[in-house]
């Protein structure tokens, strides 16, 4: 069921056709499933267990929703794209159409946990977005944010997706200033991808422009199996904060009482 809060120009954040056209491919890609498992582990590690309610902000293709539903969390997905919400809608799934650049209606539910995974890099005002989300979080709620990292890796792939920026730990921490959330930890993820992305960036500097689907194309087997194994290998290291670099950064923050 889709509830309506507000609408806005979805294509300004990420081309809506890209979301729709790549749904099947994303749901099979190891990166999205590994990220969802990491977010689930973070919720558990910070004391957020069912029946605590979760809001997945920028739920997109629904990979996080499936992971949390399988873990028996009552979860709601929020996205600006009506088209993608209609594609992932299920009779017992709770979805909200809303524009993060606008305020939210009164009388809404308060959530114990919130996911904001690879969202704020699409928005001009990252801090303002987090600040607007604060009233949706109950006191002590956990907010998990992920972003693409290392500005020197900014490439055509970022442009295609509608990314405004890539982050460093300090710039990610600054996005929480004055928002009502206190950052508890920031850590790297995807360290094994960094040299690959560096090579890809150099290779495609003068190449023919590519599409989002081109970048999502998985290499032949057994490469996808190897990718899954690398994410499993890195999972605990990322959670422990022992990685020294990565293609992504995660932040875990707590709503002030």
Q: What kind of region is each of these model predictions?
A:
Residues 1-117, 127-130, 216-220, 224, ...:
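Conserved N-terminal segment of class I S-adenosyl-L-methionine
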Residues 84, 104, 151-153, 192-193:
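Feature marks short, surface-exposed loop/turn motifs that line or immediately flank catalytic pockets
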């Amino acid at each position: 069921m889709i509830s309506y809060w507000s609408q806005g120009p979805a294509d300004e954040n990420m081309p809506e056709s890209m979301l729709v056209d790549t749904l099947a491919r994303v749901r099979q890609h190891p990166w999205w499933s590994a990220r969802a498992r990491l977010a689930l582990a973070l919720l558990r590690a910070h004391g957020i267990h069912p029946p605590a309610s979760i809001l997945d902000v920028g739920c997109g293709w629904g990979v996080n929703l499936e992971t949390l539903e399988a873990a028996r969390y009552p979860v709601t997905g929020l996205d600006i794209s009506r088209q993608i919400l209609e594609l992932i809608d299920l009779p017992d799934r709770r979805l909200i159409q809303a524009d993060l650049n606008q305020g939210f209606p009164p009388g809404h539910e308060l959530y114990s946990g919130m996911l904001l995974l690879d969202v704020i890099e699409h928005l001009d005002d990252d801090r303002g977005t987090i600040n607007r989300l604060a009233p949706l979080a109950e006191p002590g709620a956990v907010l998990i944010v992920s972003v693409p990292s290392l500005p020197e890796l900014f490439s055509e792939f970022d442009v295609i997706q509608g990314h405004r920026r890539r982050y460093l730990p300090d710039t990610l921490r600054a996005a929480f200033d004055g928002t009502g959330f206190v950052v508890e930890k920031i850590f790297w993820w995807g360290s094994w991808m960094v040299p690959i992305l560096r090579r890809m960036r150099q290779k495609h500097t003068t190449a023919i422009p590519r599409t989002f689907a081109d970048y999502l194309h998985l290499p032949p087997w057994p490469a996808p199996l190897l990718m899954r194994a690398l994410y499993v290998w890195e999972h605990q290291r990322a959670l422990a904060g022992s990685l020294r670099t990565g293609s992504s950064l995660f932040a875990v923050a707590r709503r002030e009482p």
